[in-house]
Amino acid sequence: MKIEVIKKEEDMLEFYLEGEDHTFANLLTEVLREDPHVKFVAYTIEHPITMARKPRFRVVTDGKVTPEKALEEAARKIFNRAKEVLDAWEKVVKS
């Protein structure tokens, strides 16, 4: 995974998330939408063949937090949810 910043302002960030597709892009978008400081978030895959694993994101916040902080928090939430799934799976496997 590689992040390439396209445009950065105080309350807006546009970036490519190279190496990912709709699966992770949808997850990240949904988790960002849970943040009350995120006013807009969307992604697009500009060309389905040449850019299939390089979604372009736009994140806009209310200015109380930066888009970078919103992304950090979303990444933590995704990690914690994945850990919960792993823990639940380990309980099932052990029983």
From Swiss-Prot:
The keyword Transferase applies. GO terms for molecular function: DNA binding; DNA-directed RNA polymerase activity; protein dimerization activity. PANTHER family: DNA-DIRECTED RNA POLYMERASE I,II,III (PTHR13946), DNA-DIRECTED RNA POLYMERASES I AND III SUBUNIT RPAC2 (PTHR13946:SF28). It comes from the Archaea. HAMAP family: RNApol_arch_Rpo11 (MF_00261). The gene is rpo11. SUPFAM superfamilies: RBP11-like subunits of RNA polymerase. Signal peptide: none annotated. It comes from Pyrococcus horikoshii (strain ATCC 700860 / DSM 12428 / JCM 9974 / NBRC 100139 / OT-3). Part of the RNA polymerase complex. One of its GO terms (cellular component) is DNA-directed RNA polymerase complex. The keyword Transferase applies. This is DNA-directed RNA polymerase subunit Rpo11. It catalyses: RNA(n) + a ribonucleoside 5'-triphosphate = RNA(n+1) + diphosphate.
